[in-house]
Amino acid sequence: MWGLKVLLLPVVSFALYPEEILDTHWELWKKTHRKQYNNKVDEISRRLIWEKNLKYISIHNLEASLGVHTYELAMNHLGDMTSEEVVQKMTGLKVPLSHSRSNDTLYIPEWEGRAPDSVDYRKKGYVTPVKNQGQCGSCWAFSSVGALEGQLKKKTGKLLNLSPQNLVDCVSENDGCGGGYMTNAFQYVQKNRGIDSEDAYPYVGQEESCMYNPTGKAAKCRGYREIPEGNEKALKRAVARVGPVSVAIDASLTSFQFYSKGVYYDESCNSDNLNHAVLAVGYGIQKGNKHWIIKNSWGENWGNKGYILMARNKNNACGIANLASFPKM
């Protein structure tokens, strides 16, 4: 029994006290990401989470160098948060309990001809810069706005930043920073006969009173279409033929939180646990691994300048084709 206690001591001490050898790195990370804490106890608590995440990243990248993984991780501005906190504060997908696809909104792909092997709407000028939703559950608004921006570019030739704040404040069927769903946003824009530009209705990262002003209207919508559930082939056709598509994924894993580069595939990703809305802006293949090009709304410091390549045709990894939709313009 005495020997067991001795063996457990290093583990317990690591859990209770920061590693002194990491002091300089911790201070550098805090300075880089402008982190401040309420008190010493709060900082130590966050430091221990950061150290745990740093260890996870290091072990993963060692495994990646040995060919175990197809992607790498890196420390970022979310380093002092647990994956549970990230889901709670920085996602926000909320699917209506009564949600069901109708034939009126179902996307029926045109299967004639072959879809391109790769598509990247960033290169075509359909995609605005990466945004940061902050600690507001407004991912659904950024995903919806991204799909609307793509269709606006396709129809008018103009690329404009549309207003996620307009959706956060005004879509009564959703819950603002408490979460929402993309098709509710498209329906709002249709019924409202428009959505303001970002310049006219800037993002503030919290829910406020609806201040939509028709003079700031930059786009409108005449409905939406939903991809057949779980059908990645149909999603590929939609991305190729229509443009950027709003999609929902499981973003609850630590591996997603610290993604850096490569094609993301984690067997633990749960296609039935959809909690985050993002935007599919293309697809392709890297080193033999098929992928979706996904735009996130966690800022450019996350992922590969705000983007992630997610595994494609791997049994609907992370549920990416389960709740996909796009607006009609």
Curated annotation (Swiss-Prot):
SMART domains: Inhibitor_I29 (SM00848), Pept_C1 (SM00645). It catalyses: Broad proteolytic activity. With small-molecule substrates and inhibitors, the major determinant of specificity is P2, which is preferably Leu, Met > Phe, and not Arg. Transmembrane segments: none annotated. Residues 16-114 form a propeptide. The lineage of its organism: Eukaryota, Metazoa, Chordata, Craniata, Vertebrata. The keyword Signal applies. It is a peripheral membrane protein. PROSITE patterns: THIOL_PROTEASE_ASN, THIOL_PROTEASE_CYS, THIOL_PROTEASE_HIS. Belongs to the peptidase C1 family. Disulfide bonds join C136-C177, C170-C210, C269-C318. InterPro entries: Papain-like_cys_pep_sf, Pept_asp_AS, Pept_cys_AS, Pept_his_AS, Peptidase_C1A, Peptidase_C1A_C, Peptidase_C1A_papain-like, Prot_inhib_I29. The keyword Membrane applies. One of its GO terms (cellular component) is endolysosome lumen. It is found in: Lysosome; Secreted; Apical cell membrane. It is linked to Pycnodysostosis: A rare autosomal recessive bone disorder characterized by deformity of the skull, maxilla and phalanges, osteosclerosis, and fragility of bone. Its EC number is 3.4.22.38. SUPFAM superfamilies: Cysteine proteinases. It comes from Homo sapiens. Residues 1-15 form the signal peptide. This is Cathepsin K. GO terms for biological process: bone resorption; collagen catabolic process; extracellular matrix disassembly; mitophagy; negative regulation of cartilage development; proteolysis; proteolysis involved in protein catabolic process; thyroid hormone generation. Predominantly expressed in osteoclasts (bones). Expressed in thyroid epithelial cells. It comes from the Eukaryota. Its main location: other. GO terms for molecular function: collagen binding; cysteine-type endopeptidase activity; cysteine-type peptidase activity; fibronectin binding; proteoglycan binding; serine-type endopeptidase activity.
